Regions:
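Acidic-enriched catalytic cores of C-N bond-cleaving enzymes acting on peptides and small amides
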Residues: 132-136, 155-185, 192, 205-281
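Fold-level recognition of mixed alpha/beta catalytic cores in primary-metabolism enzymes, strongest
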Residues: 71-162, 170, 174
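Glycine/charged-rich beta-loop-alpha catalytic/anionic-binding loops adjacent to active sites
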Residues: 33-47, 147-149, 352-357, 388-393
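A short beta-alpha structural unit
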Residues: 198-200, 234-247, 285-287, 295-305, ...
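Active-site-adjacent substrate-binding region
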Residues: 154, 161-164, 168-184, 337-380
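His/Asp/Glu-rich mid-to-C-terminal helical/loop segments that flank catalytic regions of hydrolases
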Residues: 95, 159-176, 203-208, 254-261, ...
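Zn-dependent metallopeptidase/amidohydrolase metal-coordination segment
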Residues: 272, 279-292, 299, 358-413
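Active-site metal-coordination/substrate-binding segment of hydrolases
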Residues: 4-84, 89-91, 96-100, 122, ...
Length: 418
């Protein structure tokens, strides 16, 4: 009875953010996950779960595999590289698709549906640094135990960014001492708030105690400041005497740390139109120091095109002031709210019938592939939804089993709607 019904597109992405705890030796490119069930929740031991967005793939495959389900023509769009700039959605050829209604299954809160999202891009700031052979005491500094999280959805939680906090510690010791930067690495993804960061500095032997005390004092202040949002934050300093190694010159060490401190991070502006919605933000997700210099990778987001343009200019001008280079890639459009949406109206009505209450329709400060696909398919009507998934992009990620079952039944009712 669905021969004349309009087709529906089911959509999600198959890649995941691959985070793991420091003591996990799993190869995230090759090894499977060790799944755990604790009550109503499923998680992965020592790693991210990949419910974002493996659940969409699971939903779609289950529906396609079940011949007993009544539905119109279904089209399943499964993209790659969503977590690194939505490259799959940007590159996909949509000419074969016939559907004008798209159900995106990349949201993480049952009962909250998305009808609009921010646009954004990635930024890569590189600074060439000179190195010399230096001898002295090596202090290895490790910041760990931060909460982390998704750099869009959880940027408003006030959580510490390990990369930014490490640069703050280094700022306090470099400005008052002859310190050489030997290593600086933190974070794995530009769109995840980094939970850990490691740095190594070389100091004169007679300055060791003074510098160590300065590090510990800075760390103490940070722990007090972030006691609520990052209760498990810890800073460890290991000392190795009599080290002779290549390290960044004092002048360039100062310049690198000053650049990081000068560049913005976090919320830039709240929405003027929607209460409690972040309009513009950025996240310093990755820092890496190698033979050529230091590289900073940011994720930028905004629901206002002019604000994103201004933020890019700000990063560019600050970088150039420190003789660094800023590049921007992977820009994706914002998904604008559609005033008239039959799909949204149907989904609200079906949800109310099943749950006895209306769902919440929201905009989100994060990238959703709906914006890119809506720009490719004229007249596309999109809604994003999903089951309860908590702490995505972190090793604490966990998925509600009962919510997953309820939302599956909900999806079946949505696709059965003519």
């Amino acid at each position: 009875g669905y021969e004349d019904a309009a087709p529906i597109i089911l959509q999600g992405h198959m890649d995941m953010v691959c985070e793991k705890t420091p003591d996990c030796d799993k190869n995230m490119d090759e090894d499977g996950l060790d799944l755990e069930v604790n009550g109503d929740f499923i998680s992965a031991k020592g790693t991210t779960l990949g419910g974002d967005d493996g659940i969409a793939v699971a939903y779609a495959l289950a529906i396609l595999d079940d011949d007993s389900i009544a539905h119109p023509r279904l089209e399943f769009v499964c993209t790659v590289s969503e977590e690194v700039g939505m490259e799959g959605a940007s590159s996909i050829d949509v000419s074969m698709l016939k559907g004008k209604k798209l159900l995106n299954m990349d949201s993480e809160e049952e009962g909250i549906m998305l009808a609009s999202c921010a646009g954004g891009c990635s930024s890569r700031v590189t600074l060439k640094l000179d190195k010399n052979k230096v001898t002295g005491t090596k202090l290895s500094i490790t910041l760990s135990g931060l909460t982390g999280g998704h750099s869009g959805v959880e940027i408003d939680k006030g959580r510490g960014n390990a990369n930014v906090l490490m640069s703050r510690i280094l700022r306090d010791v470099i400005t008052d001492n002859n310190v050489y930067l030997a290593a600086f690495n933190g974070g794995r993804k530009d769109n995840a708030i980094p939970r850990e960061c490691m740095a190594e500095i070389i100091v004169a032997a007679d300055k060791t105690a003074e510098v160590k005390a300065a590090i510990e004092n800075a760390a103490k202040e940070i722990k007090e400041e972030f006691a609520t949002s990052d209760a498990d934050l810890k800073c460890v300093v290991d000392i190795s005497e009599g080290c002779s190694t290549e390290a960044v010159t004092y002048e360039d060490s100062t310049r690198a740390v000053s650049l990081i401190q000068a560049l913005p991070n976090g919320i830039m502006r709240m929405s003027q139109d929607i209460d409690n919605l972040v309009e513009t933000s950025l996240n310093l997700g990755v820092i890496s120091l190698d033979e050529s210099g230091i590289c900073l990778r940011f994720s930028l987001r905004s629901s206002v095109g002019a604000a994103l343009k201004n933020l890019k200019s700000q990063i560019k001008f600050i970088s150039e002031a420190f003789r660094a280079n800023a590049e921007f890639t992977g820009e994706y459009p914002a998904w604008e709210y559609k005033k008239d949406s039959k799909l949204r109206d149907d989904m609200v009505r079906i949800f109310e019938q099943m749950y006895g209450k209306k769902p919440t329709i929201e905009a989100i400060h994060a990238g959703v592939e709906c914006g890119i696909l809506a720009g490719k398919i004229e007249g596309l009507d999109c809604i994003s939804m999903g089951p309860d998934i908590f702490d995505i992009h972190t090793t604490e990620e966990h998925l509600s089993i009962s919510s997953t079952k309820r939302m599956y039944e909900y999806i079946l009712n949505v696709i059965a709607c003519k």
